[in-house]
Amino acid sequence: MPTEKRQRQKEGRAARQAALQAYRRKAARRRQLITGVAVFAVVVLILVLLQRGKDNGQNVTAGSSTTAQGTTATTAAPAGKVGSSPCPPADGAAPRKIAFDGEPSPCIDPSKTYTAKFETDVGTFTVALNAKQAPKTVNNFVFLTRYHFYDGVKFHRVIPGFVVQGGDAAKGDGTGDAGYKFADELPKSVDEYKAGSLAMANSGPNTNGSQFFIVVSDAGGKQLQKPLYSLFGQVTEGLDVVQKIEADGTPQGQPKVLHQMVKVTITET
């Protein structure tokens, strides 16, 4: 009898051990399933955020024909829709305005010369605007500048050797614009982009708004590969100031230091 009792105890222990191991295997499978679902959810979330970033960022891209257009809180007016805001006075007396219901009506005289002076937190640089080659784009820039649109706006995207980008007064992170789009005025060749070139950021044909970029080197101009961005100006003085801003950029575009346009003014002669 003692032998049979020990045998039953042994069998009981074996059964309990087997049940425990089965439970542990089941629990491990459950944890793996939960972990797999969680990982899948995280991957989906990342993909959604990346896609949202593509949809909302207005970035010029090296080595690519694609860019991403920012959206404001309101739907941007399509290219060709003229807004209701009048041409601001040339003396800078207009109050600041950063949201519009359509592109500007003609406010400049293409036969005249227009110069933009950028006062930044690290110095001043000057750009000669090319109203003959890009009258619509220069008109847009002069219009926004005379409404003080760019005053205090940061250079939110800076890539060393490539571009310094700014012009988002609405959100400040590259996902905003002035509330409208307008048509392209493209150069004939990518060779026209060079150190100091001023061009518009976009998300494809005829999606210009308020954001622009400055090419920081001739090699940076070559990275654009195709003439897909409206070219409307050239830095004539203070390229070293632009390069100071460039120096605080990163390969990913997020600046180590956020520099800003303190004030931008237009001279007409």
Q: What residue spans do the PLM features occupy?
A:
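Cyclophilin-like peptidyl-prolyl cis-trans isomerases
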Residues: 1-269
